[in-house]
Amino acid sequence: MFVLKLVLKNALRHKLRTILTILGMAIAITAFGFIRTVVTAWSAGVSATSDNRMIVRHSVSFILPLPFAYRDQLERVPGVSGVSYANWFQGQYKDPGDWKNFFPRIAVDPETYFALYPEFIVPPDQFEAFKRDRNACVVGAKLARDQGFTIGDVVTVEGDIYPGRWEFVVRAIYRGKDDKTDETQLFFHYNYLDERLRQEMPGRAGYVGWYILKVASPSEMPRIARTIDDSYLNSRAGTKTETEREFTQSFVSLSSAILESLTAASYVIIGVILIVLANTILMSARERTVEYAILKTIGFSRLHIAGLIIGEAFLIAILGCTIGLALTFPAAGALARQFPTFFPVVNVEVLTLLLAIGVALIAAGVAALFPTVRAFRTRIVDGLRAVG
């Protein structure tokens, strides 16, 4: 207890220096936690994928469509227990220059799509209303909050991929089964899109963007992928079949350079934390060389001296880490508010908190190592001679 009191008094002896060190630690920890949160948010879609879903897309590029006729053929592939399809629509909603107005707009088959994605929970009465109305849409709960959508609202979108003015009536609002589920999407009837294309652009009708497969056993996925891709190898629209995780990961990999840069920045921050803390502890230990010599003279052991140095380092590190972690949550919240659809799932993960705490504690231990060894090796007479 006496040593703890001395640790506290030593830390507060130079209040300004201690406060600035704690502040520097807090800023570094906040930056570390924020960057880690950005990286995990960027990859959130990968962790939310299912182990029993596969995606069939065009072998050349995701933007190229596949014939609607493939559906019946895919249903007959052994090991496939369910098939659905979807089509990227996009378009422009309100001001396209505002990130908040960018959210996925996808044409789907209501009956099969939501059966394959049970993580999208839609109230039964709303789902029935959605199925009855051909130009109806389902929006995510987060999207509804951000845009102020309510049941019965009309969402007007100016088409770009599919030109024209498109109106969708909000008939249902889905919520995710957990915090990893994307609640920022808008789904509408594929038939609404296809029927209008048949009237206005017949050459573009009868195609879908990609197929979603539900498989009976994940172990069968490699065989199913080979079977499907070999079947369409010489067709005009070849396929690339992959697991949902691989499909999602392919989009994340497009930003790999950014993610690697952010990860590297987080490592640099660890070095900053160490330098800031080590500088303070070294200065404090050097100033107290005489005091340590006197303490040794009156009977304090080397362990007591080590406790004073290490204790001060850990006290400053813990305070800085606590403040930094407390600031990480509002920083992550600001990111989610500023880019609600670009980062649909923003959570400060437990692993991020543990890493930040671990970094702070390791930095404290390393920062205290050299001054502790120096205090051990300094003889009493040499310490007393340091006066002046």
Which positions does each model-derived feature cover?
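N-terminal Sec/SRP start-transfer signal
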Residues: M1-A31, I310, D382, G388
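Hydrophobic alpha-helical transmembrane segments of multi-pass inner-membrane transport and secretion
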Residues: R13-T40, S255-E291, F314-I323, A363-V366
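Hydrophobic, regular-secondary-structure patches
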Residues: A26-R105, V122-D133, R145, P202, ...
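Peri-transmembrane interface segments
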Residues: V38, W42, E220-I275, S284-R286, ...
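Small-residue transmembrane helix packing/gating motifs
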Residues: I55, G82, G91, V169-R223
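Hydrophobic secondary-structure segments that place a key small or acidic residue at a functional site
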Residues: A86-N87, D98-D109, F120-R196
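Transmembrane alpha-helical interface segments in multi-pass membrane proteins
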Residues: L282, V290-A336, L355, A363, ...
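Conserved transmembrane alpha-helices of multi-pass membrane proteins
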Residues: F339-F370, R377, D382-G388
